[in-house]
Amino acid sequence: MAQNKMTQNKTTQKVIITHFNSRHDFLKLLENNPGLVIVKLGATWCGPCKRIKPVLDGFFASSPDNVICCDIDVDECTDLYSYFKSKKMVNGIPVILLYKKGNVNFFPDDSITGADPVELDKFFKRCGLHLKSLAPALSVREQR
């Protein structure tokens, strides 16, 4: 079962998932993806992870309801992180993975590794483009 915490925005609360008990729980989340799932893998002892935290928190807090945000500590979710490493999907932390609606496997649609502010900005802009590309498909489904 996924565990989460609430972050307080000025007018709304955003749920951020902070733990998966198993890889199976992660796949269940992807199966119920309403638009995008964004997963940051990091650790409390990781300097670059600490540097990107304010940027990541800001993005998570301002993300729309069809974006599921996950901030996962690799020392607490060893099963998931070990699996990502064994499949060569991650090679260090921090890493942020993006999953679009319909992607129900472990391989992300987009990702970024590291704490470069310019590259982070580019990644979050790509997240916005992915959301815009989903908007017509979501509104057509909602009309049915």
PLM regions and their residue ranges:
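Short acidic active-site motifs
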Residues: 25-26, 79-80, 119
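Short active-site neighborhood of thiol/selenol oxidoreductases, capturing the structured segment around
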Residues: 32-43
